[in-house]
């Protein structure tokens, strides 16, 4: 799809796997997630997201069934059946690139580090928070002291 200004829909990225994570006053992180997770993430309009389909298809397996090989296999078989119908399951894994400011990431944490949030985005937000905190430990002691306040658990444990 093109237009007179040679612009593309910014949601679709390319070569996202080649991008490196960066954490500071601004941040950029890439991770694997599903279409469902990306849809939840897109609700944070203060952050920027891009996605790229993977060459090799894989699917999210809910943690509640992943330890049971029979249930996990049945789940994955169902995902492949849906995919074979030329329908993309919302549980298909994609590469996601998220970027924005530190302040807006903390706003996301306030919304997504909660037991009421969609499981995938809650788990990924926690993982990104811990990675962000670890990176700031050496590079930005002031932000490191701030981000530590948000690393103790769910939203109800935040200082504000």
Could you say what each language-model-derived stretch is?
Residues 1-160:
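A conserved ligand/cofactor-binding region detector
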